[in-house]
Amino acid sequence: MDKIIVEGGRTLSGEVQVSGAKNAALPILAASLLVDGWNTFYNVPELQDISTIGLLLEHLGAKVEKDGHTIKIDASGLCETEAPYDLVRRMRASVLVLGPLTARLKKARVSLPGGCAIGARPIDQHLRGLEMLGATVELSHGYVEVQAEKLRGADIYLDTPTVTGTENLMMAACLAEGVTILRNVAREPEIVALADLLNRMGGKVEGAGSPVLTITGVEALNPVEFTIIPDRIEAGTFMVAAALTEGDVLVKDAVPAHLQALISKLRLAGATVTEEGNGIRVQGKRPICSVDVKTLPHPGFPTDMQAQFMVLMTTAKGLSVIAETIFENRFIHVSELVRMGANISISQNSAVIRGVKHLSAAPVMATDLRASASLILAGLIAQGSTEIHRVYHIDRGYESIEQKFSQLGAAVRRVK
């Protein structure tokens, strides 16, 4: 099994190109199921999760052609309504086919999802929303079974602004009869990107980026060409790395509007963050100031940056508190950071970090996607050589991460 080895103590400098956003690409690729004809998607990252959803779409009857960062999909032959456990268990975002299948084929049978081991992450709001659109929903033998002879618009309030729930209901509502109003929806840039795609296809989605979406159903959607937005979490990871190593890094194609919460916290920590025409430049310096963080739905501080920012705080001056309000059980990486010498204690949904002078290299184990990124960051400042095991997690969400860090001057390599 692969492992990543990081030699600590190097300052990062130079430019790094941000890949397309996985969390935007997955629902956008799933949305191709709504359309007959060839859709062409550009700037698609080459990641394990992208490969997985490609296999799932092919299983459902779509044709999928891949050429580097371009993927073409034709769902004219869509015929299968079941997303089997063998595929869905690899990635919880597979549940995104639920809405499109219900809208196109009037039924869907999707295995309950897998992916990162971060708490329960239930899909009850997806299902309740589909019921309000007129579908019948049953849970049987580990599968969600949905049937809907005709979807009709409804006024739906989400108890929490679930991202995948918002996306599933947006896609289903586009082909429903009448007007659907979705309230308390997710406001992430990936939601805005999906709305842009659906509107390009001929859908009528209004309000993306606000708490309320209004979707007027149409008879059919049309195939399009579409470019995936840059990955704000990958960008944020490199921004933290620059601040952490006293580096000077231009993160190319990072979108400042997508990263305002992180930019604010990095500046409070003492980094210089400059918004440039082609990206975001971060210059780090020490001592790092301690900063408190509370994860919140967008535009708040993203939960997917919590683990990386925690590493920055491990050698900050003073005490900082990170409160996790989105997912339970998202401090699994803490025990690995403690093995490297970090002083972190957990109390309910908060981590209290007391800054130490330095971290020490140790063999560590990645437990989920963002935790594995945080361990690479910790290795960048640790004394000695850090070995990170179970790095298949990182391949689900970061494209060529060791090459990108290496081109910035880090000593990061993969050993098979």
From Swiss-Prot:
SUPFAM superfamilies: EPT/RTPC-like (SSF55205). It catalyses: phosphoenolpyruvate + UDP-N-acetyl-alpha-D-glucosamine = UDP-N-acetyl-3-O-(1-carboxyvinyl)-alpha-D-glucosamine + phosphate. Cell wall formation. Adds enolpyruvyl to UDP-N-acetylglucosamine. The gene is murA. Its EC number is 2.5.1.7. It comes from Desulfatibacillum aliphaticivorans. It is found in: Cytoplasm. Pathway: Cell wall biogenesis; peptidoglycan biosynthesis. The keyword Cytoplasm applies. Phosphoenolpyruvate binds at residues 22-23. This is UDP-N-acetylglucosamine 1-carboxyvinyltransferase. It comes from the Bacteria. Belongs to the EPSP synthase family. MurA subfamily. GO terms for cellular component: cytoplasm. The modification 2-(S-cysteinyl)pyruvic acid O-phosphothioketal is found at residue 116. Keywords: Cell cycle, Cell division, Cell shape, Cell wall biogenesis/degradation, Cytoplasm, Peptidoglycan synthesis, Pyruvate, Transferase. One of its GO terms (biological process) is peptidoglycan biosynthetic process.
